[in-house]
């Protein structure tokens, strides 16, 4: 019996060496590719990876908060698509959803609901979404779609856009996509600024 047990153990070790275990859920956790445009001006936005951070009531954060310098900071479509929802509710506040190709959707939550010079919470929708942005409207990547605010349960917090990215009906961590978009768009901003400076004074260099 001891010899049989030793043989089985040796066989198991050999099998492990030949066929090492793959990381659990390696395939299901891989993020599918999706190149997007950063949804706010890079020089007016701060953000971090707050995916699944704890929230009140035992909730987990299902997106990334893009902290804006001020209310009415411009919000842009991250990719071409069609607006499928423009709505308001107590938690999300004023928000919109864009459906993109290949099963992707982007959510823009806590949009502005105040007037230009008040914190009333009942400002006109013309200060929430851009002209022509309504359900069924086609939008392009980088198109102005609305303005950041503190509507819903974000009231009293720093103005921001709670941004979500969904793929085939399920939310994904948007941070890696946003980080890549931020780097691309910010580099483009610096190039445009350098071009402008070159036209004024070629000796000034942006680093």
Task: Indicate where each model-derived feature is located.
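A detector of long soluble domains/segments in diverse envelope-associated and cytosolic proteins
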Residues: 126, 137-138
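Short, conserved secondary-structure segments in the cores of folded domains
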Residues: 71-74, 129, 135
């Amino acid at each position: 019996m001891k010899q049989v047990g030793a043989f089985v153990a040796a066989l198991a070790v050999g099998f492990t060496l030949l066929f090492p275990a793959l990381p659990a859920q390696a395939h299901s956790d891989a993020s599918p590719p999706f190149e997007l445009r950063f949804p706010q001006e890079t020089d007016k936005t701060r953000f971090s990876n707050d995916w699944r951070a704890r929230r009140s009531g035992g909730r987990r954060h299902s997106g990334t908060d893009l902290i804006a310098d001020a209310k009415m900071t411009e919000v842009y479509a991250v990719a071409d698509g069609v607006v499928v929802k423009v709505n308001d509710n107590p938690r999300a506040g004023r928000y919109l959803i864009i459906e993109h190709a290949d099963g992707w959707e982007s959510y823009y939550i806590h949009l502005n609901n105040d007037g230009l010079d008040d914190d009333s919470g009942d400002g006109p929708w013309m200060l929430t979404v851009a002209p022509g942005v309504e359900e069924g409207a086609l939008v392009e990547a980088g198109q102005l779609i609305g303005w950041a605010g503190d509507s819903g349960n974000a009231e009293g917090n720093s103005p921001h856009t709670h941004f979500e990215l969904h793929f085939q009906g399920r939310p994904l961590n948007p941070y890696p996509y946003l980080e890549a978009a931020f780097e691309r768009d910010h580099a483009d901003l610096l190039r445009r600024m350098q071009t402008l400076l070159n036209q004024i004074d070629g000796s000034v260099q942006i680093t």
